[in-house]
Amino acid sequence: MDTNHPGSAGGRGGLGSIFGGGPPGYSHSDLAGVPLTGMSPLSPYLNVDPMYLVQDTDEFILPTGANKTRGRFELAFFTIGGCCISGAAFGALNGLKLGFKETQNMPWSKPKNVQILNMVTRQGALWANTLGSLALLYSAFGVIVEKTRGAEDDLNTIAAGTMTGMLYKSTGGLRGVARGGLAGLALASTFALYNNWEHIKGSSSQVSL
């Protein structure tokens, strides 16, 4: 049954003539004869089969060829900034402790406040510089090792930590280089073990079964 009455069509035509034209009116019978070529029989709104749109795993919106995880270069900024902030906070607390310890016999006055503030500032800057320098060296070595090997795994972490310790203690001679390398190796190995602890536990439980 055609629901487009002549009166309504005339009304639309009259308004269209007043405002300079309007869209032509089509009845349902006219639209029913338009062929929908290329449409999938499973969905009248898509020209592809919806089964191809089903994803079994989570997908990320990334540029073509981009990795799904952050690389060493992207994490370097967070690592350096986090170490600087952590060092400044730890140094400030340590400086506050040392300031109160050194001025415990002084009366509470302006010189005492200035001395405590100087100690807080000095210790905060010292620790922020130390941890920031270590983070910078670690991140630089991590990026170099990643680009050289073409892979990102725990071996890069261990190698970067070892080289960071060796370079940081290089001013102490061969003995200092050895100590720094061993310290960096121990810390990096502990960090890698912590990151893979759940995987190691799962693998050991599967082997026991």
Swiss-Prot record:
Q: Which UniProt keywords apply?
A: Membrane, Mitochondrion, Mitochondrion inner membrane, Protein transport, Translocation, Transmembrane, Transmembrane helix, Transport
Q: Which terms in the GO cellular component ontology are assigned? A: TIM23 mitochondrial import inner membrane translocase complex
Per the record, membrane topology reads: Multi-pass membrane protein
Main site of residence?
mitochondrion
Q: Which Pfam families match?
A: Tim17
Q: Where are the transmembrane segments?
A: 73-93, 125-145, 180-200
Q: What Gene Ontology molecular-function terms does this entry list?
A: protein transmembrane transporter activity
Intracellular or extracellular location(s): Mitochondrion inner membrane
* GO terms classed as biological process: protein import into mitochondrial matrix
> Signal: present as a keyword of the record?
no
Where on the tree of life does the source sit, at the highest rank?
Eukaryota
Cross-referenced InterPro entries:
Tim23, Tim23-like
Q: How does it assemble?
A: Component of the TIM23 complex at least composed of timm23, timm17 and timm50. The complex interacts with the timm44 component of the PAM complex.
**Biological role:** Essential component of the TIM23 complex, a complex that mediates the translocation of transit peptide-containing proteins across the mitochondrial inner membrane.
Q: Which family does it belong to?
A: Belongs to the Tim17/Tim22/Tim23 family.
Specify the protein name. Answer: Mitochondrial import inner membrane translocase subunit Tim23
Organism the protein comes from? Xenopus laevis
